[in-house]
Amino acid sequence: MIKIDSSELDKFSVYLKTKSEEDEKKIKKILKNSAMTIQKDAISNLTKNGSVKTGHLRRGVANFRRGMTATVHTSNIKYAVMVEKGTKAHIIKPKNKKALYWKGASHPVKKVNHPGSKAKPYLIPAFEKETPYFLKKLEEAIEW
């Protein structure tokens, strides 16, 4: 008859479970801090690169965390990507009216030949700035 003592294996299993729970808490804290840093830097970048007219985009930069996932985004702001990446030259035509008019225009017009807009990145630079720090903190937190 062969008898196998698995008590040490059970102890090791409990250790691994405890260790993984501790690591998960550390990782969640690192994610939270990095998401907040990216959000803060993105808002700062918007101000620095002159993208703030009304403050709507700046107020729309938010972070969201669930479990082991964190996102930094501009929710419900349709023009956010256009500020980040710029636009090509395009024609603007009225959707519901016969002509376009804006404050300061001398008269209504049927279309506008928009020259496009230069990219003013704010979110990607904030992410790229934080990434090395995030990876370093993650490496320090998870001891192999």
Regions found by a protein language model. Give the residues of each.
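Short, Lys/Arg-rich flexible segments
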Residues: 1-80, 93-144
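Short, His- and charge-rich active-site/binding loops that engage polyanionic ligands
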Residues: 90
